[in-house]
Swiss-Prot record:
Belongs to the UPF0045 family. It comes from the Archaea. Pfam families: Thiamine_BP. One of its GO terms (cellular component) is cytosol. Homotetramer. This is UPF0045 protein MTH_1187. It comes from Methanothermobacter thermautotrophicus (strain ATCC 29096 / DSM 1053 / JCM 10044 / NBRC 100330 / Delta H). InterPro entries: MTH1187/YkoF-like, Thiamine_BP, UPF0045_domain.
Length: 99
């Protein structure tokens, strides 16, 4: 299981509101076989393998461009753990057990 944090930022928009661009990216993710969680600062992803993750990243990136942005800045953090099959909720629960 691969977990990741994705942030896609449209640049040069005429507004400080970015929710319509985020919505376009999420609509693109809905069409794929990845689990996602939206947060106030980015989107968390779970994928079975790197190819599946990168397909989702590309889809979200392209969706923001298609939504009208002429320039997009995308950041991606990947946790590719292969010794155990742990998802996003497992990570949160592990911390909660310790506090």
């Amino acid at each position: 299981m691969i977990t990741a944090e994705l942030t896609v930022i449209p640049l040069g928009t005429c507004s400080t509101s970015l929710s319509s661009y985020v919505a376009a990216a999420v609509e693109a993710l809905k069409k794929l076989n990845v689990r996602y969680e939206i947060s106030g600062m980015g989107t968390l992803l779970e994928a079975e393998d790197l190819d599946e993750l990168m397909e989702a990243v590309k889809a979200a990136h392209e969706a923001v461009l298609q939504a009208g942005s002429d320039r997009v800045y995308t950041t991606l953090k990947i946790d590719d753990r292969r010794d155990a099959d742990r998802g996003l909720r497992d990570k949160v629960e592990s911390v909660k057990e310790k506090i």
